[in-house]
Amino acid sequence: MRRQNSKIKIKNLGFTLIELLVVISIIGILASLTLVSYTGAQKQTRDTQRRSDLNQYRNALENYAGANNGLYPAGLDSMAALCGADNPLDTAFIASCPVDPLNAGGYVYGFFSSATGDAYLIYGGLETGGFWEICSNGKSGKVAVEPSSSACGL
């Protein structure tokens, strides 16, 4: 009788194939959910960096205006013109022009200024959709359509 009891105990110590498959499936589902949320968090982090970069540009432009009778660089229609070879925001106003965290096309910063230099608009594409816009009138926020002039869309 003792032998039969020991055989039964040995058989009950292992897991069935079904139990193992259920556990592996649950682990796979949890891993995929974690990966999806991690990717979303990375996008939000880069979008936060973009908003911070645009605020650096805002500060530099406001400092520029403070040193130039309240006027911003006039008639510019791109970030390349603002931060290019003829950089009106020289090192006195901004140490270096921030670039998009991904440094890959699609998510870039844009800049428009009025012909008279009394208004500007800076913006950046967001990975979570839309564009973050900062206007010379102090407004900032998310817009759905990419800006095409210095007119504030907020």
Residue ranges and their predicted role:
Residues 11-38:
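N-terminal single-pass transmembrane signal-anchor helix
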Residues 130-138:
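Active-site and glycan-interaction determinants of carbohydrate-active enzymes
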Residues 1-15:
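N-terminal leader/signal peptides at the extreme start of proteins
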Residues 35-55:
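Aliphatic-rich helix starts adjacent to a transmembrane/signal segment
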Residues 140-154:
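Short, low-complexity, Pro/Ser/Thr/Gly-rich segments in the mature regions of secreted, periplasmic
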Residues 62, 66-130, 153-154:
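Extracellular/periplasmic head regions of type IV pilus-like filament subunits
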